[in-house]
């Protein structure tokens, strides 16, 4: 379920928000203001779900999945504005460096965070181990929000061919999918890759259970 929420919540909302995002002269207000409410704030409910677990496991699961879905859908809804803001701030010849460098640093910090979370899960009793892990995630993503708020976005007028309504946006998407063979093949490839990844979660559970 977490895998489905993670993938669907990231990609699906972008289809509904891309058109309205394209019509905005500035994307930063969406990324900062809307992003805080839809993407950052939900993670602060995860420690509450862990605290509720000893008293009401059902309530804890409801809070957890609701907060996780809220976070995922919010991140997907804001993603077009974030991507456009990054494109405005970095020229074409610098974007690969930006994404590569940030992915490298983020992965390294993620490894350290995973190791520290594993240590907390072992050394603290339940539910405090999960409370501390979730709290660390909430604090970290909030700190990243403050860094993101320092971004200086160049103001640009919306493109002349920007979709004027949601219906026009969907028509524009269909024209691109039907007319661009390479992009259509790319979408099919991404779909098949994600289908192939469906078994990874079961492999992880099986490894933990048998090994």
Model-derived regions: residue spans:
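Helix-loop junctions at membrane interfaces in 12-TM secondary transporters
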Residues: 45-67
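Substrate-agnostic recognition of the 12-TM MFS/MFS-like secondary transporter fold
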Residues: 1-22, 31-39, 63-153, 185, ...
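Membrane-interface helix caps of multi-pass secondary transporters
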Residues: 203-211
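Perimembrane helix-loop junctions in membrane proteins
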Residues: 50-57, 92, 148-158
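Juxtamembrane/transmembrane-helix boundary motifs in multi-pass membrane proteins
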Residues: 26, 55-59, 93-97, 127-128, ...
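Juxtamembrane intracellular "pre-TM" segments in multi-pass secondary transporters
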Residues: 155-189
């Amino acid at each position: 379920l977490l895998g489905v929420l993670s993938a669907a919540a990231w990609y699906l909302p972008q289809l509904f928000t891309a058109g309205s995002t394209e019509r905005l002269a500035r994307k930063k207000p969406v990324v900062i203001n809307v992003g805080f409410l839809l993407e950052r704030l939900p993670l602060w409910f995860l420690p509450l779900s862990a605290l509720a677990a000893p008293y009401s496991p059902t309530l804890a699961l409801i809070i957890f999945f609701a907060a996780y879905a809220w976070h995922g859908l919010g991140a997907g809804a804001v993603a077009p504005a974030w991507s456009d803001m990054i494109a405005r701030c970095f020229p074409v010849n610098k974007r690969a460096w930006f994404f590569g460098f940030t992915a490298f640093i983020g992965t390294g910090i993620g490894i350290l965070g995973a190791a520290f979370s594993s240590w907390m899960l072992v050394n603290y009793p339940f539910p405090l181990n999960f409370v501390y892990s979730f709290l660390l995630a909430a604090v970290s993503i909030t700190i990243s929000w403050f860094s993101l708020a320092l971004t200086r976005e160049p103001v640009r007028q919306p493109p002349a061919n920007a979709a004027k309504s949601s219906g026009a946006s969907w028509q524009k998407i269909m024209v691109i999918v039907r007319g661009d063979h390479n992009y259509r093949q790319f979408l099919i490839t991404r779909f098949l890759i994600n289908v192939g990844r469906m078994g990874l979660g079961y492999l992880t559970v099986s490894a933990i259970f048998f090994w």
